Amino acid sequence: LMEAMQKGKEQGLKCVIFTFDIPPKAIHKDTYNVLSTNEEKAHIFAEAGVDYLIECPFTDDFRQLSPYAFLQMLKEKINVKMIVAGTDFHFGYQRAGSFRELQQYADDLGYEAVIVKKKQYKGEDISSTRIRKEIAEGNMEEANYLLGYSYFLTGPGLHGNEIGRTIGIPTANQRPEEFKLLPPKGVYAVEILAEGKQYDGISNVGCKPTIEGVNPMGVETFLFDYSGNLYGKDIKVSFLK
């Protein structure tokens, strides 16, 4: 992303992120995990200074585009001048296109192909698979280093039984989107962005242990030095460790 933004700035081009409304692998899987929801991706890109975000519906017709047809579509629809991608980039029907095809078709379609080598950490490639593994094992500090930011969850505050408020500790309950990857059940140190202000706190990931009965997985966050009502308000919880 930073490479694309830097290259665009050097040549006076707008930085456009092209993504899909659902992960392509979701077509064939009933269960899958995402690091960021569509809303969270938009937040990340906006903070980074991306000019435009295109969220394309991943339809059957689109899925069957050949690598060349996919690149041709980008040229015709948004007049792409430069495409920045990693060495593990795949595109087109059945992921038939790679960075090699991206370079091969560049002259014919009139764009510049920029290929970025994967970065490594502790002798291994930094990848979404590796980051998912760290989060799934609860290694939040390691995951955050690989991400370059603190892994976070966004969503509105939901009504609970208000037990925290009765003991003087304001809490915010959140129900993540179905496929959002959560760390294992447990308690985590977090930072909370609420009503435009930053707060420290702790989050419990699990089946809301302060509430009796069986509940779906959720996140219950205790905010330090906060007084107010977060029900229905957008909250960002960043997991630190």
Q: What are the residue ranges of the model-derived segments?
A:
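Short glycine/serine/threonine/alanine-rich loop segments
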Residues: 11-13, 50, 111, 149, ...
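Conserved beta-strand termini and adjacent loop/short-helix elements that scaffold enzyme active sites
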Residues: 20, 56, 116-118, 160, ...
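Phosphate/ribose-recognition catalytic cores of enzymes acting on nucleotide-derived substrates
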Residues: 160-241
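A structural signal for isolated positions on well-ordered beta-strands in alpha/beta enzyme cores
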Residues: 14-16, 52, 82, 114, ...
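Short secondary-structure boundary segments
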Residues: 57, 87, 205-207
